[in-house]
A protein has these predicted regions:
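Contiguous mid-protein beta-loop-alpha structural module that forms a pocket-lining wall or clamp
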Residues: 148
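Gly/Ser/Thr/Ala-enriched C-terminal appendages of enzymes
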Residues: 140, 145, 154-313
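Buried, small/hydrophobic-residue-enriched core segments of structured protein domains
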Residues: 1-143, 155-160, 164-165, 177, ...
Length: 313
């Protein structure tokens, strides 16, 4: 609640004088803690939450937007926009930074018309994007279309955006963690989808999966289903972790495939006894070279290389 209050103040204060904030932090905390955070944020002046349970439990107004995965699961960005507009109407908020912001804004206005509700920008130079997108929207006749910014915002970055032509913010991580606490910026990123509308085993064969990836500045993705192999040096120590875009076919005698099936059809199949897990951890540590155990910030224990054999992914 304290973090939310600071953010509301940084955004200009509660009510009509400030820019509205949407609480979007449920994916960063326990599911019921997310509901509690949404309630606390609303008390502190947030306008709404993306958590539907908070609406059901406490009557907190709900709002939201689409995810990058929604765009990536479509063949074209325009297809994703068209589907969202058909389902939610022209007052919806379209996410425009999956590939190219300028082209996405043009497509969004072309499909929705000047009555488009809002566009959301989640990456890149947010102040610069806000200025250029505002100018572009105005030139296309969408002068009432709002600009919503998201992307690891906190009270300090919100204050820094005070002079940018922005209409609102979405805040997640910094809100639900109380702001100022260390966090791991780990999120779900869609990297591949089936080339058929079915989800049977044949459709999920890696050779039939379509590689997809976000290409926005600052948050690019690396598309494709992946396999990981830990390679060993001549001395027997783990030397490299190689990420492949196809099942490994040329393994050294001591190389180890790292991926193992744990869940199949929604059922856990890979659970191991506690003693076995403890032994496996000890064996994995013994594989590492001595320098990998140094506590040095910014250096990997062992390097990760992308590519199949000599071909980079």
């Amino acid at each position: 609640a304290s973090a939310a209050s600071r953010m509301v103040t940084a955004a200009g204060g509660p009510g009509s004088d400030g820019r509205p904030l949407i609480e979007m932090g449920s994916r960063r905390t326990h599911e019921w803690a997310g509901v509690a955070a949404a309630r606390a944020a609303y008390i502190a002046g947030f306008a709404s939450t993306s958590n539907l349970q908070a609406r059901l439990s406490y009557g907190v107004p709900s709002s939201g937007t689409s995810a990058h995965a929604f765009t990536l699961v479509h063949d074209e960005e325009r297809d994703a926009f068209r589907a969202q507009l058909t389902s939610l109407g022209h007052d919806t908020t379209l996410l425009v930074d999956t590939f190219n912001v300028e082209q996405a804004v043009r497509d969004a206005v072309e499909l929705a018309g000047p009555s488009l509700g809002a566009v959301r920008i989640d990456s890149g130079d947010l102040p610069a994007h806000a200025v250029s997108v505002r100018a572009l929207l105005d030139s296309l006749g969408a002068k009432d279309t709002r600009i919503i910014l998201t992307g690891d915002l906190d009270e300090y970055s919100i204050a820094g955006l005070a002079v940018a032509p922005v209409d609102g913010y979405g805040v997640g991580t910094s809100l639900v963690t109380g702001s100022g606490a260390p966090t791991a910026a780990l999120v779900y990123k869609l990297v591949a989808r089936s080339d058929t509308p079915t989800a049977d085993d044949e459709a999920l064969d890696y050779r039939r999966l379509v590689s997809v990836a976000k290409r926005s500045v600052g948050k690019p993705g690396r598309g494709g289903r992946k396999w990981a192999v830990r390679e060993r040096s001549a001395s027997g120590d783990a030397s490299t972790e190689r990420i492949l875009l196809a099942p490994p076919t040329e393994l050294g005698p001591e190389d180890r495939v790292l991926l193992h099936e744990l869940v199949r059809g929604g059922k856990i199949i890979g659970r191991e006894p506690l003693a076995d897990a403890r032994s496996r951890h000890a064996a994995a540590l013994a594989d590492l070279p001595s320098y990998a155990l140094q506590l040095s910030r910014g250096y990997p224990a062992i390097p990760t290389v992308f590519g199949t054999n000599d071909e980079e992914a």
